[in-house]
């Protein structure tokens, strides 16, 4: 009887873990999506990178995107 209960609980645990993992995979932001600074929203191997925007020397806020970790964009010299 104990074996049946233990087996049932083990199966329930496995099914619960699989369901949680599937929900977490669908909730991430793909590459190029707008994100916030909390890095948790981007999919794996992506980071939330933020850049300050300026127009005519005046700061116009900050934009953040999910981009590959370690990738850096720079302004092209004119």
From Swiss-Prot:
One Pfam family it belongs to: Toxin_35
Tissue: Expressed by the venom gland.
Signal peptide residue numbers: 1-22
Keywords recorded for this protein, A-Z: Disulfide bond, Secreted, Signal, Toxin
One term of GO molecular function: toxin activity
Annotated InterPro entries: Spider_toxin_CSTX_knottin
Modification after translation: Contains 4 disulfide bonds.
GO cellular component: extracellular region
Propeptide segments, given as residue ranges: 23-26
Subcellular localization: Secreted
Similarity comment text for this entry: Belongs to the neurotoxin 19 (CSTX) family. 07 (U7-Lctx) subfamily.
Record protein name field: U7-lycotoxin-Ls1d
Protein source organism: Lycosa singoriensis (Wolf spider)
């Amino acid at each position: 009887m104990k074996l049946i209960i233990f087996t049932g609980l083990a199966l329930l645990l496995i099914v619960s873990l699989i369901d949680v993992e599937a929900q977490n995979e669908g909730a991430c932001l793909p590459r190029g999506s707008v994100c916030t600074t909390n890095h948790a929203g981007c999919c794996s191997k992506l980071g939330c990178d933020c850049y300050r925007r300026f127009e005519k020397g005046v700061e116009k806020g900050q934009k953040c995107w999910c981009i590959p970790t370690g990738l850096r964009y720079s302004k092209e010299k004119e």
